[in-house]
Amino acid sequence: MFMADAYLADTVWYVGQIIFIVAICLLVTIVVVAFLATFKLCIQLCGMCNTLVLSPSIYVFNRGRQFYEFYNDVKPPVLDVDDV
């Protein structure tokens, strides 16, 4: 009778250990997947920042420089004060 109780207690202990190990593995998997999803989201946001902020800024800067150079080429010469 005592041996049957000991085997049952050992079996319950082993099953408990298996459940504990599976739970820890699931928890670690969830944490790793959450970290990777966060990392992927950050990379996507950086790409969106490049598309929405950096590229238009470079475009506006280049167009402004082109207009400035064009204006300097076509503006009339400055009159001297004596000629006015």
From Swiss-Prot:
TM spans (from-to): 19-39
Stretches assigned to the Virion surface side: 1-18
Entry's localization field: Host Golgi apparatus membrane
Location, primary (coarse class): host cell
GO CC term (a single one): membrane
Keywords from the UniProt entry: Apoptosis, Host Golgi apparatus, Host membrane, Membrane, Transmembrane, Transmembrane helix
GO biological process terms, semicolon-separated: disruption of cellular anatomical structure in another organism; viral budding from Golgi membrane
Pfam families: CoV_E
Membrane topology qualifier: Single-pass type III membrane protein
Intrachain disulfide bonds: none
UniProt topological domain (Intravirion) ranges: 40-80
Family: Belongs to the betacoronaviruses E protein family.
Stored HAMAP family: BETA_CORONA_E (MF_04204)
Record text on subunit structure and interactions: Homopentamer. Interacts with membrane protein M in the budding compartment of the host cell, which is located between endoplasmic reticulum and the Golgi complex. Interacts with Nucleoprotein.
Role of this protein: Plays a central role in virus morphogenesis and assembly. Acts as a viroporin and self-assembles in host membranes forming pentameric protein-lipid pores that allow ion transport. Also plays a role in the induction of apoptosis.
Name of the protein: Envelope small membrane protein
Natural source organism: Human coronavirus OC43
Primary gene name: E
